[in-house]
């Protein structure tokens, strides 16, 4: 299968070499790799140039944006800029972060998944992060049928059906919900162990939690599902304040009448899907 990779990169000189090296070693080679140099002021650009010489399918796109960390919107905006440079001749498209190391056979196995399971729209492995001893251990705070936003592969038909990625926090949740809305499945493979070099949530703060609550509003979760989802995250993180911050973000978005990310019909489907999952867990 033919596939293309888009890698948003903002000041990634520490990790980018490892990420691009893992792409270069893939047993199934991509047809193109676009690294979006998003307003970097470190050695990110020179690293991309170095790899472009080694492997001509690796291309650089430089854009100018804010230096602020904007969870969700900044990375998706960079991805969308890269998407504009792509040819249309791919079977699946990959959104990859600049701080992950993929196993050499990663995309060979992703291609097998898409070939063998025509209904699969999104596929990926699991993230492993270093603990205090330096050992890589699985860190997957979401459900096992969720693919982390750092290494997502989308079947072309699914990507087009859901209208690409939403430029907002929560994009890597709404994409899977919309994929299911359009009749596609999510597939995770436990054998695909991805090394994530930057611990999850390291750059997140109170502002990010407010945006998370806003995302739940814009996905049309409704208050009760937002409350349950926020409480679950707060419990897993051991941070009660994150529950309050999420709810504050939700009601701020509601009072400001922020535009929704999904249609009324999509929202109805999403709520039904969420309630089904919640009830399923309660009955276990």
Predicted feature residues:
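Non-catalytic, C-terminal membrane-associated alpha-helical segments of glycosyltransferases
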Residues: 208-284
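Conserved donor NDP-sugar-binding/catalytic core segment of glycosyltransferases
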Residues: 101-137
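Short, acidic, metal-binding catalytic loop of nucleotide-sugar glycosyltransferases
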Residues: 21-30
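Conserved nucleotide-sugar donor-binding
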Residues: 148-163
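Short beta-strand-to-loop acidic/aromatic patch adjacent to the donor-nucleotide binding site
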Residues: 89-101
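A conserved acidic beta->alpha catalytic loop
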Residues: 37-46, 100
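Short beta-strand/loop segment that forms part of the nucleotide-sugar
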Residues: 30-39, 62-63
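Active-site nucleotide-sugar/metal-binding loop of Leloir-type enzymes
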Residues: 76-92
């Amino acid at each position: 299968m033919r596939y293309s990779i888009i890698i948003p990169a903002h000041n990634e000189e520490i990790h980018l070499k490892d990420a691009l090296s893992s792409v270069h070693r893939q047993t199934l080679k991509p047809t193109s790799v676009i690294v979006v140099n998003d307003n970097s002021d470190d050695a990110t650009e020179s690293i991309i140039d170095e790899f472009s010489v080694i492997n001509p399918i690796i291309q650089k796109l430089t854009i100018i944006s804010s230096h602020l960390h904007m969870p969700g919107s900044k990375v998706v905006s960079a991805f969308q800029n890269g998407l504009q440079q792509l040819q249309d001749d791919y079977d699946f498209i990959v959104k990859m972060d600049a701080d992950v190391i993929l196993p050499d056979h990663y995309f060979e196995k992703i291609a097998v998944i898409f070939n063998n399971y025509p209904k699969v729209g999104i596929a990926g492995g699991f993230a492993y992060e270093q603990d205090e001893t330096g050992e890589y251990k699985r860190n997957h705070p979401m459900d096992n049928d969720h693919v982390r936003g750092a290494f997502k592969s989308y079947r072309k038909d699914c990507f087009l059906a859901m209208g690409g990625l939403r430029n907002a926090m929560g994009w890597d949740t709404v994409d899977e919900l919309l994929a299911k809305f359009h009749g596609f499945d999510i597939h995770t493979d436990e054998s695909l162990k991805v090394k994530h070099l930057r611990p999850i949530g390291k750059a997140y703060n109170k502002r990010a939690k407010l945006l998370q609550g806003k995302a739940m509003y814009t996905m049309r979760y409704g208050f009760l599902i937002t409350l349950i989802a926020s409480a679950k995250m707060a419990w897993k993180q051991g941070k009660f304040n994150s529950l309050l911050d999420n709810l504050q973000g939700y009601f701020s978005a509601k009072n400001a009448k922020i535009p929704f990310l999904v249609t009324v019909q999509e929202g109805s489907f999403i709520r039904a899907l969420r309630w089904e999952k919640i009830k399923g867990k309660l009955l276990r």
